[in-house]
């Protein structure tokens, strides 16, 4: 498979959300860079007997909204996007990895994200959905990455027997059904995440592309410690660098960053649930190795773990409600200037001193799994 093999890719996406005859399918796209993907998916959906509507949600227009719109308008669900969720049985959003320059008051950016988060909640509750993140040369250049490498890894990440991957990951999730505590640790600190009584679920070719992770919803008041995310990533058009979070009894009580701190604080103050975690996840896609700065891709990398302040997956037993759901990725492999780290769940090592252990590598998708040394 290569980056332009859209016919294969969109069949995987359509299979993942179960597009079938009579379905009402809404499609969003954030930039013309993904138009070939959108066209291929629309054609595939019509071929299957669905009714398809396409909405342009180009993120470049956000700058005008941020400049002129009142706060109450920014923080409300965009009406056309909300109407699409009410109409749809299936929703797919093709999101180009672009680098819009957002220069606005962080409180206004957070308000805009809050409005979009309301649409995301509708998407979760009402539709069978998928997000497809697509790399671009512009993104690679902005993040000082080799564009060919990023595209090559991205294309390879689709190439798996997803039904078999789902079986393997489900078996691991079943194994974790009695787990009590997950711990992420490195030389900068440790974060203890309570997961007792929660359900783990596999993401294996259904709601996000690239895909490949297992995840659960932390117990709301059972997360404590400190975690640091070295390096830079982008959220809402703003670069956040060297983020550090401190949690006590499930609540984020302090945040620090060398860049983007004002946005971080504004996002975490969005509503009552934004300072509690809604997700704890572990990446399982071995085809992805490069931290791109795009959270939707990086969270799938084998050797990483991630947390998400905000809205919890109810299917995991999570009850935290928020307009925010913000995945933040911790690279435990020691790449990109950060130290090697470890992940254990109860007394079982999943990643130890930067090395993926067999319990995790054996469920990996993509290129041949990594194996811990004997």
Where are the regions that the model predicts?
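PLD/PLD-like phosphodiesterase catalytic module centered on the HKD motif
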Residues: 86-88, 92, 187-198, 204-221, ...
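Internal helix-turn-beta structural module
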Residues: 293-371
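Short, solvent-exposed amphipathic alpha-helical segments in soluble enzyme
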Residues: 41-47, 199-200, 243-246, 272, ...
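Short solvent-exposed loop/turn micro-motifs enriched in small/polar/acidic residues
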Residues: 10, 176-177, 220, 236-239, ...
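Dual-mode signal for accessory low-complexity, basic/Gly-rich regions
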Residues: 224, 254-321
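Short, glycine-/Ser/Thr-/acidic-enriched flexible segments
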Residues: 32-33, 97-99, 136, 198, ...
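Long, well-ordered mid-to-C-terminal structural blocks that present hydrophobic/aromatic surfaces
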Residues: 221-266
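Active-site bordering "gate/hinge" segments
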Residues: 1-225, 360-374
């Amino acid at each position: 498979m290569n980056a332009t093999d859209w016919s294969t890719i969109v069949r995987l996406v359509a299979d993942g959300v179960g597009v079938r005859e009579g379905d009402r399918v809404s499609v969003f796209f954030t930039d013309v860079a993904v138009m070939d993907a959108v066209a291929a998916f629309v054609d595939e959906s019509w071929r299957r007997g669905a009714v398809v509507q396409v909405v342009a949600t180009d993120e470049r227009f956000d700058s005008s909204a941020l400049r002129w719109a009142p706060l109450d308008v920014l923080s409300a669900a965009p009406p056309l996007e909300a109407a699409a969720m009410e109409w749809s049985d299936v929703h797919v959003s093709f999101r180009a990895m672009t680098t819009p320059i957002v220069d606005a008051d962080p409180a206004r950016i957070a308000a805009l994200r809050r409005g979009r988060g309301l649409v995301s909640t509708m998407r979760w509750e009402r539709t069978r959905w998928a997000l497809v993140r697509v790399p671009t040369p512009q993104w690679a250049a902005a993040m000082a990455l080799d564009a060919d490498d990023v595209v090559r890894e991205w294309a390879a990440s689709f190439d798996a027997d997803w039904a078999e991957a789902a079986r393997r990951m489900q078996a691991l999730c079943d194994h974790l059904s009695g787990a009590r505590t997950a711990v992420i640790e490195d030389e900068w600190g440790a974060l203890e995440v309570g997961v007792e009584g929660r359900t783990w679920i596999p993401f294996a070719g259904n709601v996000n592309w690239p895909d490949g992770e297992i995840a659960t919803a932390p117990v709301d008041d059972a997360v404590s410690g400190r975690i640091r995310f070295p390096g830079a990533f982008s959220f809402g058009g703003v670069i956040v660098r060297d983020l550090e979070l401190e949690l006590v009894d499930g609540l984020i009580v302090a945040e620090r960053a060398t860049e983007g701190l004002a946005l971080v604080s504004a996002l975490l103050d969005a509503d009552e649930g934004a300072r509690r975690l809604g997700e704890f996840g572990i990446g399982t896609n071995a085809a992805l190795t490069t931290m791109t700065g795009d959270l939707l891709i990086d969270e799938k990398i084998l050797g990483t773990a991630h947390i998400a302040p905000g809205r919890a997956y109810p299917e995991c037993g999570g009850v935290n409600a928020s307009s925010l759901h913000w995945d933040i990725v911790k690279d435990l492999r020691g790449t990109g200037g950060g130290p090697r780290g470890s992940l254990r769940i109860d007394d079982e090592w999943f990643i130890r001193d930067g090395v993926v252990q067999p319990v995790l590598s054996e469920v990996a998708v993509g290129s041949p799994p990594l194996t811990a040394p004997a």
